[in-house]
Amino acid sequence: MRSLLTTTLLILSIYSNAQKNPTTTELVMSMSQRSLVMPGYLPDLKALIARQAYEFWKEGNVEPYVSHLNVYQALYEANKYLGYDSVRNMAYNQVGMHSNTVTSVVFGSDPNFYYSSSTDGKVLKWDLTSPRSIPETIYESDKIVQSIEMSNDGKVLMAILYQEGLALISTEKNPHEDIKVLEDPQPVQTATFIPGERKYLTVAKSGELILKGFNTKSEQVGKTALKINQLKVDEQDGTIYAGTEEGVLEAWEKPYQVKESPIEDIMENWRQQSYFGYKLGSFSINCLDISPSGDILAIGRDRGDIVLWDIPKKQLIRIISGHQSTVTDIQFNPKGDLLLTTSRDGTARIWDLTDSRKLPIILDDHDEWVFTGSFNPSGTQVITGGGDEYIRTWPVDPSYLAFRICAMINRNLTQEEWDEFVGRDIPYSMTCSD
């Protein structure tokens, strides 16, 4: 795994300073690492070692900022080889029906279904309750689907076509009728829905921001000379945020006024400053999201970092560094305490925003760049997609992975295995007791 060496070094660095029951912490880390390096042709043993490490982690007085990361990775890798489809070379949490890069994944109003888009020109609808079922093709084009967005009510899906226009696709299908699709042929840089309204906002290739409605006249609400990568509209006050290729974050506040760019670079005052010796500079802004509380704007940049911006105070909160390449997508979970990021470094990461000392959970199983990620509506799962054409589902809570191991295996560690991988001085117990 690409991130395993870096992760291990981080773990060892933090562990060297751990003062809280180092014996248990060391045992959990050692067993997790041994499970990770155990070959896949010993799936039961690999899984039982990971599950027992989880039991020690859950029950013991373990150093909290290290072990959760190791435990999650070991549990995930162990689960990967339980029920592995060697014919199709696919793990239990992996599906693939796109023939090219997966560019977006989004959920609608029904938490059991999600949608994906690809450079192959298709938009597919997937059933989470039946992951091996064939997805429904709800839209198909000979153009590249740059991204998709869902309206707040979950009734309309927007497919943004690269260097082209967009398609508005009804998700409410009558079984006796074809899926309704409304085409907007005007070429756009990007687009988004207006929260709470039956309107959407586009950025024309010439830079005009145009507000459009299903039954209303189009209205220009802004203009920019910069290349816009993504739009985000604040649900609370209607402010439009635009992340640009030039690294400028523009904003249009209500009442909207058509002005020449730049409208407002809200990061201008600190762009040349340092943050813990870290030069901020100007790097392309690729993705934006606003926290459920409406107080924080998360900004993903080409540098591989995430800027957290205090919206009411208009000031920097902190910068999160960890990705080795461009951040491609970003999303808060429904509670606003976790942040999901994806990157061209081939990983997705889940960051705990309540404690900056906690290492992120690193989701490292894609073979290419990871372009998109999304929490499910309950925040219990993450869906990711990328350049390897596959979509993967990840539980946020490692307890699900631990439970699946015992559901898939009908044995426990033998005494000999316990002595080898746990320790002769530690009393034997059943890893899967139920």
Feature roles, as predicted:
Residues 109-110, 152-153, 195-196, 235-237, ...:
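Residue-level detector of Asp-centered blade-edge/turn motifs that repeat once per structural unit
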Residues 90-95, 132-138, 176-182, 217-223, ...:
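A short beta-strand motif characteristic of beta-propeller blades
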Residues 117-119, 161-162, 204-205, 243-245, ...:
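Conserved strand-to-loop turn within each blade of WD40 beta-propeller repeats
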